[in-house]
C-alpha cells in the first residue's frame, strides 16, 4: 500500500490549526506535500436555500425553512450575529413571489451583513457546456470501440437523448436549473464555491467592497450551527470538506466546504468530470471525485486516512443537525 497521510496533519482541525500553524506549515498525502493555506477572518460565509415549494410559506414569512425541527433561517441569522465582521451570503433559487422577494430585502435591511444572492442573477456561463457536445463525445467514444466491445444499447440511448434535447435548452447549467431535487442544490453549490469571492463582488451587493473576486469562501449547510467566531482557518492546498463517520466508516460530504480562492483546481477537476459524463452526479463526481483526482487519491490509499487529510472540522460548529430529524423536503 502506498504511503497515505503524514501524521502532522492531525493538528489541522479548526482552531487547533491556529495554535500550531507556525510549527506545521505542511501536510502530505500520497507522497506529496501541501501547504496549509490560511482562510482569514473576513472570508465570507455562504449558505444556500433552494426552495422547491415556495407556496408553503405564509404571508410575511421569509421563504427559508424555519421550524422547530429545521430552524434554518434562525441558524443563518445566528451566524450573521456571531460573525458580524463577515459577509454572510445566502444563495437562493425558486419561483418566489414579489412579496417573498420583499421579505428577503427586509431580512437584508434588518441584518446588514446578510446578502441574498439570487441564482438567476449570477453569471455561471464560464462553467457551462452544451449538452449536445457531452452526448456527441460519448457517442464518438462508443463508436471508436471495436464492434465486439461496443455497448450498442447505451449507444442507442445516447443518440435518442441527443435528439430529445429541447430547443433552447442545450446547456448543462440550464438542465440543472430546471430540476427540483437535491442535484439542483448540489450542482449550483459547486458552481457557487467555484466563484467563491466573485459570487459576492459580481452581483453588486453593497458592503462587499472588501472582498476580492479571487478570494475564497466558507460554505455551510443551513443545518450547521455556529456557536462562536471561526477565526482563521487552514486547509491543505486551500480546500477542506465536512466528513461524516458512521460505524467508523468515513465519507466526504458537501455540508461544509472551505476554499481559499476562487476556481479551486479540485473543484475544476470535478467540473471536468461533470462535463465528460452523461450520467454525472454533482456530489459524487463534481465534488468527491474532483477532490480525489486533485490530491491523486486512488484505491491503493486508505480512504479513511484521506478523509482525515481533507476534513474540515471546527469546535465552534455543530454539524449536520438535520440528521436527527425528518427531511425538510
UniProtKB/Swiss-Prot annotation:
The active site is at residue 253. It is found in: Secreted; Host cytoplasm. Auto-glycosylated: arginine GlcNAcylation is required for activity toward death domain-containing host target proteins. One of its GO terms (biological process) is symbiont-mediated suppression of host programmed cell death. UDP-N-acetyl-alpha-D-glucosamine binds at residues 48-50, 72, 219-222, 322, 327-329. It holds the Pfam family SseK_NleB. Changing residue 253 to A: Abolished protein-arginine N-acetylglucosaminyltransferase activity. Does not affect ability to interact with substrate host protein FADD. GO terms for cellular component: extracellular region; host cell cytoplasm. Changing residue 185 to A: Does not affect protein-arginine N-acetylglucosaminyltransferase activity. Changing residue 13 to A: In 4RA; abolished auto-GlcNAcylation and reduced activity toward death domain-containing host target proteins. Coiled coil: none annotated. Keywords: Glycoprotein, Glycosyltransferase, Host cytoplasm, Manganese, Metal-binding, Secreted, Toxin, Transferase, Virulence. It catalyses: L-arginyl-[protein] + UDP-N-acetyl-alpha-D-glucosamine = N(omega)-(N-acetyl-beta-D-glucosaminyl)-L-arginyl-[protein] + UDP + H(+). Changing residue 189 to A: Abolished protein-arginine N-acetylglucosaminyltransferase activity. Changing residue 159 to A: In 4RA; abolished auto-GlcNAcylation and reduced activity toward death domain-containing host target proteins. It is an enzyme of class 2 (transferase). Its main location: secreted. Its cofactor is Mn(2+). One of its GO terms (molecular function) is manganese ion binding. Belongs to the glycosyltransferase NleB family. This is Protein-arginine N-acetylglucosaminyltransferase NleB1. It comes from Escherichia coli O127:H6 (strain E2348/69 / EPEC). The lineage of its organism: Bacteria, Pseudomonadati, Pseudomonadota, Gammaproteobacteria, Enterobacterales.
Amino acid at each position: 500500500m502506498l504511503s497515505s497521510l503524514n501524521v502532522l496533519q492531525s493538528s489541522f482541525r479548526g482552531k487547533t490549526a491556529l495554535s500550531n500553524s507556525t510549527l506545521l506549515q505542511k501536510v502530505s498525502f500520497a507522497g506529496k506535500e501541501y501547504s496549509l493555506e490560511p482562510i482569514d477572518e473576513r472570508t465570507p460565509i455562504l449558505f444556500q436555500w433552494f426552495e422547491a415549494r415556495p407556496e408553503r410559506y405564509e404571508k410575511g414569512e421569509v421563504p427559508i425553512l424555519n421550524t422547530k425541527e429545521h430552524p434554518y433561517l434562525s441558524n443563518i441569522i445566528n451566524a450573521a450575529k456571531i460573525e458580524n465582521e463577515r459577509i454572510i451570503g445566502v444563495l437562493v433559487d425558486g419561483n418566489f413571489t414579489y412579496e417573498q422577494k420583499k421579505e428577503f430585502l427586509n431580512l437584508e435591511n434588518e441584518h446588514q451583513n446578510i446578502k441574498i444572492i439570487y441564482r438567476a442573477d449570477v453569471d455561471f456561463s464560464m462553467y457551462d457546456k452544451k449538452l449536445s457536445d457531452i452526448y456527441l463525445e460519448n457517442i464518438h467514444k462508443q463508436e471508436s470501440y471495436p464492434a465486439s466491445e461496443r455497448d450498442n444499447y447505451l449507444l442507442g440511448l445516447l443518440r435518442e437523448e441527443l435528439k430529445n434535447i429541447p430547443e433552447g435548452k442545450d446547456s448543462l447549467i440550464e438542465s440543472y436549473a430546471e430540476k427540483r431535487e437535491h442535484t439542483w442544490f448540489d450542482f449550483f453549490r459547486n458552481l457557487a464555491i467555484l466563484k467563491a469571492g466573485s459570487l459576492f463582488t459580481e452581483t453588486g451587493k453593497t458592503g462587499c467592497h472588501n472582498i476580492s473576486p479571487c478570494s475564497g469562501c466558507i460554505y455551510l449547510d443551513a443545518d450547521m450551527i455556529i456557536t462562536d467566531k471561526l477565526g482563521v482557518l487552514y486547509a491543505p492546498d486551500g480546500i477542506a470538506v465536512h466528513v461524516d463517520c458512521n460505524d467508523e466508516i468515513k465519507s466526504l460530504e458537501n455540508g461544509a466546504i472551505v476554499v481559499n480562492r476562487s476556481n479551486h483546481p479540485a473543484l475544476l477537476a470535478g467540473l471536468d468530470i461533470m462535463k465528460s459524463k452523461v450520467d454525472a452526479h454533482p456530489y459524487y463526481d463534481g465534488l468527491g471525485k474532483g477532490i480525489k483526482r486533485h490530491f491523486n487519491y486512488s484505491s491503493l490509499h486508505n480512504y479513511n486516512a484521506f478523509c482525515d487529510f481533507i476534513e474540515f472540522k471546527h469546535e465552534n460548529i455543530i454539524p449536520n443537525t438535520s440528521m436527527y430529524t425528518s427531511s425538510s423536503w
